[in-house]
Amino acid sequence: MDWHSFRIAALLLTSLVVLEVNSEFQIQVRDHNAKNGTIKWHSIRRQKREWIKFAAACREGEDNSKRNPIAKIHSDCAANQPVTYRISGVGIDQPPYGIFIINQKTGEINITSIVDREVTPFFIIYCRALNAQGQDLENPLELRVRVMDINDNPPVFSMTTFLGQIEENSNANTLVMKLNATDADEPNNLNSMIAFKIIRQEPSDSPMFIINRKTGEIRTMNNFLDREQYSQYSLVVRGSDRDGGADGMSAESECSITILDVNDNIPYLEQSSYDITIEENALHSQLVQIRVIDLDEEFSDNWKAIIFFISGNEGNWFEIEMNERTNVGTLKVVKPLDYEAMKNLQLSIGVRNVAEFHQSIISQYRLTATMVTVTVLNVIEGSVFRPGSKTFVVDSRMEANHRVGEFVATDLDTGRASTNVRYEMGNNPENLLVVDSRTGIITLRNRVTMEQYQRLNGEYKGTVLSIDDSLQRTCTGTIVIELSGTGWVTGSESGGSSSGSGDDRDRVTNGYQGTSSTENPQRVTGSWGGSGIDGTRPNTNPFQGDPDETLETPLYGDNVHFGPAGIGLLIMGFLVLGLVPFLLICCDCGGAPGGGAGFEPVPECSDGAIHTWAVEGPQPEPHEGITTICVPQMPPGNANVIEYIDNSGVYTNEYCGREMQDLGGGERTTGFELMDGVKTSAAPEICQEYSGTLRRNSMRECRDGGLNMNFMESYFCQKAYAYADEDEGRPSNDCLLIYDIEGVGSPAGSVGCCSFIGEDLDESFLDTLGPKFKKLADISLGKEIDSYPDSDPSWPPQSTEPMCPQHTEPLGSGHPPISPHFGTTTVISENAYHSGPGVQHPVPIPDPLGYGNVTVRESYTTSGTLKPSVHFHDNQQASNVVVTERVVGPISGADLHGMLEIPDLRGGANVIVTERVIAPGSSLPTSLTIPNPQETSNVVVTERVIQPTSGMIGNLSMTPELSSAHNVIVTERVVSGAGMSEIAGTAGLGGVGGIGSSGLVSTTMGASGTGLNMGGTATIGHMRSSSDHHFSQTVGSASPSMARSRITKYNTVQYSK
């Protein structure tokens, strides 16, 4: 190689390059002028152009104005002419507006606002250079401005809570789930690079999971996951950008991991062994409950168990039924056990799950047997046929009563033939066989005929019953007879011994059923149903066995026919039917007597209306005075009647339901009422030895009668109301009227305390009333009205009469009633005492003792200035006393001195006090006593009016001592006065405590006056041995309004409101 030449060539090349770089190329262009024909050369020099300056990058989230201008554009045309620069694009004339601006003269581009890379990663600016005419001097230029990213966005997980699941005992590094998180910063940048980390685990015993830092995959750390220990885990995972750097942003999310169950627990029984006892031949649906324990998830196939027999149940005597809800197995006995064959059984059972065992424990499973000891108890079993079927052969040569064989039941307890059973034929086709009831020997009833052979088709099948009456058990054995041979006789040759004409008694005894026929062409075919035979008695139905088998029995004709007598009766019946229309035409029940059509209307208020009495027949006549008498002696043969009833102890006090029954040889009563209030109900009995008439009372205890006691009581109460209203609505001619307002109902003259009494003292109307008041009072009180009042004050006795016990039959004799005693009537018409200026001695009113029906008309007393004492004597033994008015009043300011006493009516019966008026003048003595009847019965006090004045000082006592009173009525008590300073005391109605008292009626007590203060207590007691009831009533200062009394029925106590 010639190195010298090489050096020369290299040197020349280097010189050429240097010359090229440092030299300036010039191009001359010839300019030919065609006009003058001259040529001019111009030299052109090539220079480098500057049109654009590259734009600087912008950072997001910062103020980039310090970098302005971020770009500058320039055109070479600006040297020859003015150039205008303009820009357009996103951030300029497109949203977002106004981010970039340009200097149109210099071409500098500036940024004016903060940009966001997540909104606009970069900007493209279109630049133009325009001349003065707006034409483009250069081609449009694209200027790209990139926005630099900053870490301003944290990672975001796609789910708040991630759910995952994994089976327990899973291998290590098994994928559970994968987390997903994103970052809005620039991709493939450190700002968007996320790193995952588990920061918390619950339960926090030991870490069980790991996570991939880059991908977010969660995997198992080991294979120790156990659902029975922890069925669920909760993880908290954190994701941080900038690859988990300290300056990165982070976010957290939860992960819930469920541990799935696998069959990794071997089930076992609750008990290690079981002992049970069962009777032989018994079937049990619930012999024993076997509980299985499994720790796997409940109600899953891993938890459900199956108990099976390992050994001991070779005969399939037992079954085990599992309950899938409780995992409990029930041991059942499905086949009877025999004590003689097996006294004890050893069952070996095992348990497993429905699902297969998990591979982690399949090598550890070992079958464990649980022993079940079954003890069989011996019972008396009775008999059974062994074998259950026997076959015999019968040929045509066997005659009647030929022994076919024997079929004997075997006693299961002893294994020998039973001796305490009886045998009967069950299903016995053709009634062919007979069995001995004691020995079980089977014989032919009759010789087998050809007809029977043909119907049986050469083979007989029947049943034999073995009945044990002591055990009430029945067993059945089957008999099969093969009919072999030839030469079977016909029915005529067998001597009429076919089944159709056999002995009916045998047929009933042996339970015939089957098919039979005779030579009679008339047959009836039907189905006969049999009833089974229980263990206590044999079946007496002659047809038993299969109810669907057909029985053919002969139907024999008779000579019954329709004779002439029957034809005649039939014709006569048709003739009678033909007369019916004619009789209807002739009957005038459908029209008026004059021949008019239509039915006659029933007249109103005729005898066909409903009667007011409660018994059939005509209106009963009132029977007064019929005495109820009990016969003291009875015939010794009657056991249904009481021995005696004292005739003085029977007392009736009812108005409702009276009946008299004449039984023609015996009397009957259904109710009695004793004087002391005890009622006795007697069952209706008949005495055959005595005759007479008794009275029956339909009382509350005996409601068998036609009358309703509630209705009758309501009726009489309404009557009492009507009488009370009528009495109160009358003109004020029989009572004392008090008026508070002048001019309303008061006299027109001068008003004084006694100015209007004169009109009220006219008692002439009492002359015409008579005993009406007494009867009205008796009706209101519910007492019986006697035609002849008893003047004996001791009647009724308190406790001497015997009580008729319930459900007894007192007898009445036929003697006439005993006439009662008659008393005299004393009438005191009027006694008036006028006071003068002198001294007047007290004048007593004579007290008639021992009289009955006493009527005190009027007592009027006035006193002078010396104030003498006035004394009214009491009627000590008066009966049926009527006190209409008692008026005590001084004249023109006269005063009463001493004791003002109104006599008592002790011992009086049926006392009526209509008014008691005390109207003193200026003063009254210190004590004012209104005595009260203590031993009276049926007392009626309608009004008590007291008008004291200011001079009355002391105690005012109106305390009736009605300890033995009956049917007491107090309608009104009015206490009033003008100008009173004070009246203090106690007003009471007592002594009606409940021994012998009945029917009390009390009304209000009014008091008025200036400064009047009056307090009292009214005490009311129940009657008829009932408990005492107390009613408190305080009398204060109130307006003396006129109280209207209404009688109210409250059990046996009457009171007014």
From Swiss-Prot:
Signal peptide (UniProt feature, chain positions): 1-23
Protein's GO biological process: homophilic cell adhesion via plasma membrane adhesion molecules
A molecular-function term among this protein's GO annotations: calcium ion binding
Bias-annotated ranges (Polar residues): 510-525
Region (Disordered): 490-552
Chain ranges passing through the membrane: 565-585
Membrane topology: Single-pass type I membrane protein
Origin superkingdom: Eukaryota
All ranges on the Cytoplasmic side of the membrane: 586-1057
Organs and tissues of expression: Expressed in testis.
Ranges where the Cadherin domain occurs: 50-157, 158-269, 270-389, 386-493
Pfam families noted in UniProt: CADH_Y-type_LIR, Cadherin
Entry note about domains: Three calcium ions are usually bound at the interface of each cadherin domain and rigidify the connections, imparting a strong curvature to the full-length ectodomain.
Protein name in the entry: Desmoglein-1-alpha
Source organism (scientific name): Mus musculus (Mouse)
